[in-house]
Amino acid sequence: MKNIFSILKLTFLMVVLFAVIYPLAIYGIAQFAPNKGKGETISVNEKVVGYQKIGQKFDQSNYFWGRPSAVDYNAAGSGGSNKAASNPDYLALVQKRIDTFLIAHPYLKKLEIPADMVTASGSGLDPNISPEGALIQVKRVAEVRKLSEEKVKALVENKINKPTLAGTSTVNVLELNVALDELK
């Protein structure tokens, strides 16, 4: 009987600690973060159009395209495809993405397409692409929008995020497309 009360006390203590105190502490700390821990929003005319850390689907020719998503950009079902690079289904899917990309960019050769433009990220929601992935789309976007390639290329170069310490440079696709809509 003594053991049962000890176990119940420990269980109650752990529930209070991890279900009440810890979440409240994290919530309190988040209040000091930008946007109070509610995510880094991107707004246009005071209307939230997306989040900086969650990718969105862009497949219109007048916008820059992001990375493909294994979960069709469903944030609730975030995840990769879990298929090996040697899986025939995966290879067929990547080939289909390459074919689609080449149809929209007939001036490119297959080997010029950066891997991030035809492979999904581990989360399936990556908001960023490589600068190379953005730069190879400049011609298509400029032609469709009837803008000079130089102007669109300058916009891309302005939106390249350099790594803080280590890593690679990236371009946030939503931020780039919002800035693109602001171009005249």
From Swiss-Prot:
Keyword RNA-binding assigned: no
Functional note: Part of the high-affinity ATP-driven potassium transport (or Kdp) system, which catalyzes the hydrolysis of ATP coupled with the electrogenic transport of potassium into the cytoplasm. This subunit acts as a catalytic chaperone that increases the ATP-binding affinity of the ATP-hydrolyzing subunit KdpB by the formation of a transient KdpB/KdpC/ATP ternary complex.
PANTHER family in the cross-refs: POTASSIUM-TRANSPORTING ATPASE C CHAIN, POTASSIUM-TRANSPORTING ATPASE KDPC SUBUNIT
Entry's localization field: Cell inner membrane
A Pfam cross-reference name: KdpC
Family: Belongs to the KdpC family.
Native organism: Flavobacterium psychrophilum (strain ATCC 49511 / DSM 21280 / CIP 103535 / JIP02/86)
Record's protein name: Potassium-transporting ATPase KdpC subunit
Database matches in InterPro entries: KdpC
GO cellular component term, pick one: plasma membrane
Coiled coil (residue ranges): none
